[in-house]
């Protein structure tokens, strides 16, 4: 999996940062997919500067209904249709997302020529496609807001082909069945259990993408043990009280959560427009003083998970 940040500014865009949107390229060899997390104004413009196009999108996850995470959605949906794209699209989001989308399309005389499903979510598991699952966790913000935990299912371990050949199993289709953990019957009547020839499963990757939030009870469960945690760092330590009063977090709070949750890497985003490049580096240093494995997301930065 890889993350591509399309927008990293909090509240309003700046000359170098658009408002929030994050692409997740699933990069699966047999089931490709491109997911979008939040869709602030101008997201479709940002998408034009990447190697991806809206036709590749199959799922959009909205954290909450504040404009800097949402106002780019109607335009993206319409442009996707006007480009002749017919692949289905599913939108997940809190209560009100359906009304927002349907109202925007209706009053502008717009529509989609592709199947569009809108799923209004609550806390809990919202998706399992057989390869990965997505769970929504409630956050602390003035509007109903969620963070998303994306977990790949464990992958089967490597098949011991050498041992199978020694046991008289010919390479070919039977190996595929054994790789799936099935039991096969050879021509001589012997039964071979694939599980006996598989190494330990390979743990899947886990990723936590937070919406806007102040410190909250669900944060630790959302982030616990993930490989990568994406979290806002709207304001610096000296402005922590102001951040919390508006349902946001400081650098210290983001980094402390990453340390307590035992994550592999913290990526900070959603930085206030008050910070220029020098100020953003200061935010990064504050986080690294608590959790060294911290990176700062800029627009179009790509991170592997």
Swiss-Prot record:
SMART domains: Lactamase_B (SM00849). Binds 2 Zn(2+) ions. Its EC number is 3.1.-.-. It is an enzyme of class 3 (hydrolase). Disruption phenotype: Mutants are unaffected in growth. Activated by cobalt and manganese. Strongly inhibited by the presence of a 3'-CCA sequence or a 3'-phosphoryl group. SUPFAM superfamilies: Metallo-hydrolase/oxidoreductase. Zn(2+) 2 binds at residues 68-69, 212, 270. Gene3D superfamilies: Ribonuclease Z/Hydroxyacylglutathione hydrolase-like. One of its GO terms (molecular function) is RNA exonuclease activity, producing 5'-phosphomonoesters. It comes from the Bacteria. Zn(2+) 1 binds at residues 64, 66, 141, 212. The active site is at 68 (proton acceptor). Its cofactor is Zn(2+). Keywords: Endonuclease, Exonuclease, Hydrolase, Metal-binding, Nuclease, tRNA processing, Zinc. InterPro entries: Metallo-B-lactamas, RibonucZ/Hydroxyglut_hydro, Rnase_BN, RNase_Z/BN. The keyword tRNA processing applies. One of its GO terms (biological process) is tRNA processing. Homodimer. Zinc phosphodiesterase, which has both exoribonuclease and endoribonuclease activities, depending on the nature of the substrate and of the added divalent cation, and on its 3'-terminal structure. Can process the 3' termini of both CCA-less and CCA-containing tRNA precursors. CCA-less tRNAs are cleaved endonucleolytically after the discriminator base, whereas residues following the CCA sequence can be removed exonucleolytically or endonucleolytically in CCA-containing molecules. Does not remove the CCA sequence. May also be involved in the degradation of mRNAs. Belongs to the RNase Z family. RNase BN subfamily. This is Ribonuclease BN. It comes from Escherichia coli (strain K12).
